[in-house]
């Protein structure tokens, strides 16, 4: 579960390395974000020459969480780190590649583009 002030890694090649959650989108009482949710983030660490710079504010969709997700067959998928993919104003990925695995649950949230850019889909 991701809440405000949580630090996440960026799983794409947009140039950002670490981001901090500043708002969880989706209703007035939506306090925690889970896999596939959209959050507003601030860039905390970025590489020089990237598409984004430190201090910028973007939206991002969560692709990996430590909490994991329970599927309908009872299996659970958990990851070592929390990660997200940065989105632009039109809710399209900023980067052209997605590093690491993503889950099939993103398809139900209408993020098929992220799944096609990912190295592996679990």
Swiss-Prot record:
Signal peptide stretch: none
GO biological process, alphabetically ordered: translation
UniProt KW keywords: Ribonucleoprotein, Ribosomal protein, RNA-binding, rRNA-binding
Annotated InterPro entries: Ribosomal_uL14, Ribosomal_uL14_bac-type, Ribosomal_uL14_CS, Ribosomal_uL14_sf
GO cellular component annotations of the record: cytosolic large ribosomal subunit
Gene3D superfamilies cross-referenced by the UniProt entry: Ribosomal protein L14
Keyword Ribosomal protein among UniProt keywords: yes
GO MF annotation terms: large ribosomal subunit rRNA binding; structural constituent of ribosome
UniProt cross-references to Pfam families, sorted A to Z: Ribosomal_L14
SMART domains: Ribosomal_L14
Physiological role: Binds to 23S rRNA. Forms part of two intersubunit bridges in the 70S ribosome.
Subunit structure comment from the entry: Part of the 50S ribosomal subunit. Forms a cluster with proteins L3 and L19. In the 70S ribosome, L14 and L19 interact and together make contacts with the 16S rRNA in bridges B5 and B8.
HAMAP family: Ribosomal_uL14 (MF_01367)
Family to which the UniProt record says this protein belongs: Belongs to the universal ribosomal protein uL14 family.
Official protein name in the record: Large ribosomal subunit protein uL14
